[in-house]
């Protein structure tokens, strides 16, 4: 693309900047006094803008930055930023002093950049469209500029892409052309209209007949070549990250497409989207520490939901047969590349089906989404080729543990102590000290099986794999297995060693459900009491973000609902953030959440 070299204020010493500010402002004022009131309103805006802006623009664009120039990380200091901001604020003041508003109310766009690229792709090099018939209007942010002689180029970026503005002195008055060169800063949001042309070098451009500053940017954008590289700052100022790195914004466009495809897929099977409470009287449906708030008017504690499950099941009790919800979940736990305290899931429930139906649905959702955003089913994730072609492997947890570790849990017997010793001996060379502690703390054979699976097997499940038939001790909401005592009809889907989905044949026996939930509460409260005893101070901050010191209560209303009768059903929860990570090749969950939760800035 012609003239894409960005001219940056950070490459200009401040003394030179201030010297240029003084001289160019005097020049611009003279220009404004001679001609400005004869311009159209749009051009008057640009003309008046130049009278107040020549200074900083000249400084910001007088020297092209390049790969061999000093990094903006050193020159774009707080003092430099404040100097830039001060100069740009003076431009704003002068604009308003002339009765012109540098923050427009509206601009009529006729096309997006991408539409223009498509509509006028037929233009040959050097060919121009009919100026009277094909007058177009566009708006976007100035991300690059260059001016020399009787020609100036601006690169404008909108939501769809970029387009070049071709600014000839012959088309604009002498005053207007100088004002264009001197006033417009990189980062400004500009509206422009004109005819279409493909330059001799092949760049499709708008030959500008008129322009207007729509929003005056006060702070400089990151350096073109070094960009916004501070990871923490990228997450804290995601808006700047999106401007500096267009591929970041593309992730969120693809995320939106994935969510849309999920809705389209499940609704094609007759599922109804519903909404359930975010503020709940009891945090149920999962075992996780909730966020707690207090409702002043009601005088009671409320919890941000940790799952949507229990209210969606109430919908089945109420007579709906296929329901789903895409919504935010909140868990007051640790943060990692795979965990954010606020995340998005789809949970769905279908009456008169079992967990085999949900395996088919999980395959369909993921493959449909991959085709929608990637156009293929073989994708790359962080250097590993993932094949999403159906059908996916389906294997029991027992068999996978035996396959990877050689330990057959069916032969360990009922003695928990002996089972722990056998496992620790067999895996002594692969277990970390914390893993051994976790094994010793297991309270049942089911917990022990799951612990070995999570530590040793789970990371090895790279290709899509359904892990079936989880122990009943860790699955309080799942129906008992029809053929294997002590197990449940539950599966989890793993891809790239990460859990993507969790599903059950849902437990509908209200008596069994109460017994299991009461046992879960009893076990948790025992751990909680131990955690409180071990705490040095009652209110001391713990290093472990996932400790057991929070309270768990029964959702009595849910248990009451079950007693009215819930039909046989299957249900599934699928993590949308992790699915987006997979399909956009994003390494961290923070890369797919626009504004992730972060530590307080020091």
From Swiss-Prot:
Main location: plastid
Key word NAD present: no
Keyword line: Aminoacyl-tRNA synthetase, ATP-binding, Calcium, Chloroplast, DNA-binding, Ligase, Metal-binding, Mitochondrion, Nucleotide-binding, Plastid, Protein biosynthesis, Transit peptide
Residues the record lists as binding ATP: 331-333, 339-340, 499-500, 575-578
PROSITE patterns in alphabetical order: AA_TRNA_LIGASE_II
Enzyme class: ligase
Cofactor requirement: Ca(2+)
EC number: 6.1.1.6
Biased composition (Low complexity): 50-62
Reported function: Catalyzes the specific attachment of an amino acid to its cognate tRNA in a 2 step reaction: the amino acid (AA) is first activated by ATP to form AA-AMP and then transferred to the acceptor end of the tRNA.
Disruption phenotype: Lethal. In heterozygous plants, aborted ovules.
Natural source organism: Arabidopsis thaliana
Similarity annotation: Belongs to the class-II aminoacyl-tRNA synthetase family.
Cell compartments where the protein resides: Plastid, Chloroplast; Mitochondrion
Catalytic activity: tRNA(Lys) + L-lysine + ATP = L-lysyl-tRNA(Lys) + AMP + diphosphate
Residue numbers binding substrate: 285, 309, 347, 349, 502, 506
Entry's Gene Ontology BP terms: lysyl-tRNA aminoacylation; plant ovule development
Span list, region Disordered: 50-83, 524-550
GO cellular component, as recorded: chloroplast; mitochondrion
Protein name as annotated: Lysine--tRNA ligase, chloroplastic/mitochondrial
Molecular function as annotated in GO: ATP binding; DNA binding; lysine-tRNA ligase activity; metal ion binding; mRNA binding
Record carries keyword Metal-binding: yes
Biased composition (Basic and acidic residues): 524-543
Gene3D superfamilies from the UniProt entry: Bira Bifunctional Protein, Domain 2, Nucleic acid-binding proteins
